[in-house]
């Protein structure tokens, strides 16, 4: 079932998924109750479980990469290692499309540098990403939110909003939210 059909069947609005505004009740979710927003999150997570994708996420402590140059260098290194370890997988495709919204210059620089270093420049296609236009951009947002929430659980740093959305039971969070994404994670 398509996500739009699932939302309609549940009487939920069909709005482009964006985790932070959804969780905090900002536009375009401002007029929706928390329970409605949680149902929308559940519908989107259900879509993510069924969607055919593989992913890899990276997380860094600010204190370990305070300087922008240090972050860019470390992220590039980690991307190069990941891409090299998975080169056979990526070489199965004629084109590797990179959708990114250029939101953070350091991330953009590391992505371009690592991908251009490991993969053939003719094989990499860069595209601007928009949550309104590309559902995979929304999937990435959901994955990042779940992975960040996992880190917050591990460090006992849940916010009040995190607790309202995901609860405070870490095993339940892992079972109900995180494990479905982890199955799609590339090593």
Regions found by a protein language model. Give the residues of each.
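Phosphate-ester processing/binding pockets and catalytic centers
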Residues: 1-187
